[in-house]
Amino acid sequence: MNKNEKMVRSLMGTVVSNKMNDTVVVRVERRVKHPKYGKFIKRSTKIHAHDKGNECQIGDIVTIRECRPISKTKSWTLVKINERAEKVE
């Protein structure tokens, strides 16, 4: 890695909303250990990500990476769609 390159955070999650123009809401799940009981618990956070071209559908599994702030709530951008959601007819 050169001096000019920065480590960029990237996460994988599921698209839960695509109703906004050029924006998707991605739910990212993580597992944390309960401090007292030691059981692993699922915790999730919802992140707004920039989706140029409105490619994502609800249920898609996507990779997002951190970028400069695009708006008040958006500072992540879509890298790729790992898995498409199945169409239900």
From Swiss-Prot:
Database matches in InterPro entries: NA-bd_OB-fold, Ribosomal_uS17, Ribosomal_uS17_bact/chlr, Ribosomal_uS17_CS
Positions in coiled-coil regions: none
Pfam families in the cross-refs: Ribosomal_S17 (PF00366)
Gene Ontology BP, a term: translation
Gene Ontology molecular function: any one: structural constituent of ribosome
Keywords: Ribonucleoprotein, Ribosomal protein, RNA-binding, rRNA-binding
Superkingdom of origin: Bacteria
Record's GO cellular component terms: cytosolic small ribosomal subunit
Task of the protein: One of the primary rRNA binding proteins, it binds specifically to the 5'-end of 16S ribosomal RNA.
Protein family membership: Belongs to the universal ribosomal protein uS17 family.
Known partners and oligomeric status: Part of the 30S ribosomal subunit.
Database matches in PANTHER family: 40S RIBOSOMAL PROTEIN S11 FAMILY MEMBER, SMALL RIBOSOMAL SUBUNIT PROTEIN US17M
Family matches, as NCBIfam families: PRK05610.1 (NF004123), uS17_bact (TIGR03635)
Name the record gives this protein: Small ribosomal subunit protein uS17
The species this protein was found in: Coxiella burnetii (strain RSA 331 / Henzerling II)
